[in-house]
Amino acid sequence: MSERLTFNKTVKNIVNKIQNSGAEAALYMIHAYVEPHENTNPQMIKDIKKMYIDAGNENNALVIPVGIAFENSYSENPDIKLHKHYDGSHPNLLGTYLAACVVFASITQISPKKVEYSYFNKINNEDKAYLQKIAHETVENFYDINL
């Protein structure tokens, strides 16, 4: 069975359980791998976007565009580091903060620019403002809304 088919069946099963309980389902769109991950592939984010958007549409589930935010951030600022340097898979503190801002804005439809939290001041004001801007723009563009 293909990875995509397995993903679609799993999403359908889990989303049905969630919706049958009276709750709303959301799909957290993952980000693509980066170097040094052995499976780094420039096409990966396109495949991820299609897979999550299709699954969200087919199952009436909210798609939270974290992967797109990572892509947008790397496109705008290729020098930023959002992944752990040793594996290229897991987000570092900045990547985690960006993801949290996207989740916040997607669920609340409130701009993450209004979030004051910076992980106990571990994220400097410049990075915080940049990541909030990326999250804000990504969510607005993905859902075609104004935050």
Give the residues covered by each predicted segment.
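Alpha-helical cap/lid subdomain in secreted, periplasmic
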Residues: 1-93, 105
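Conserved catalytic region of serine esterases and O-acyltransferases that act on ester linkages
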Residues: 90, 100-147
